[in-house]
Amino acid sequence: MVLAALIREEIPIPDGVDVTIDGGVTVKGPKWELSRKFNHSEISMAVEDDKVVLEVKFPKKKDKAMIGTVRAHISNMITGVTEGFRYRMKIVYAHFPMSVKVAGDKVVIENFLGERHPRTARFVGDTKVQVKGDEVEITGINKEHVGQTMANIEQATKIKGRDPRVFQDGIYLVSKE
């Protein structure tokens, strides 16, 4: 079996974005900045000619998987500081009119399936949530924080003990932008 002596991944850096590597990766965009530590000693990172270069010499199976993961994280950071991430969710109810509002760092869901106690879902990081009519819009620069906030809202409206084919009430993901 022949092993690769070197795996090299390159991530292009768009204009207006500055990437620095010292112990971690810091990505500065026109408006925002993100930083993250990657504690994978086998992966060497450098910035060369408007590209982030990731290399692993004599990679093992875990190193091959990890270099792809690190590449995806860095490209998500670049996308986050340039464009940001926006997830849209739809409030669906058939039996009881549900009201959703933002209170501090959490979303409060009232009258879900006629329950008297409100359900709550926390924001993660510096994610922003807006409720407009029957739509919930989640925006932020960190894809993981936006996705986890969306998952928290969706889990807060999970129905237990009832047939989900009949009781389709909840807040569901409609689009990712």
UniProtKB/Swiss-Prot annotation:
Domain of life: Archaea
Keywords, comma-separated and alphabetical: Ribonucleoprotein, Ribosomal protein, RNA-binding, rRNA-binding
GO BP, one annotated term: cytoplasmic translation
GO MF terms held by the record: rRNA binding; structural constituent of ribosome
Bilayer-spanning residue ranges: none
S-S bonds: none
Annotated InterPro entries: Ribosomal_uL6-like (IPR000702), Ribosomal_uL6-like_a/b-dom_sf (IPR036789), Ribosomal_uL6_a/b-dom (IPR020040), Ribosomal_uL6_arc (IPR019907), Ribosomal_uL6_CS2 (IPR002359)
Pfam family, one: Ribosomal_L6
GO cellular component annotations of the record: cytosolic large ribosomal subunit
Function (record text): This protein binds to the 23S rRNA, and is important in its secondary structure. It is located near the subunit interface in the base of the L7/L12 stalk, and near the tRNA binding site of the peptidyltransferase center.
Subunit structure: Part of the 50S ribosomal subunit.
Family of the protein in this entry: Belongs to the universal ribosomal protein uL6 family.
Entry protein name: Large ribosomal subunit protein uL6
Lineage start: Archaea, Methanobacteriati, Methanobacteriota, Methanomada group, Methanobacteria
Name of the coding gene: rpl6
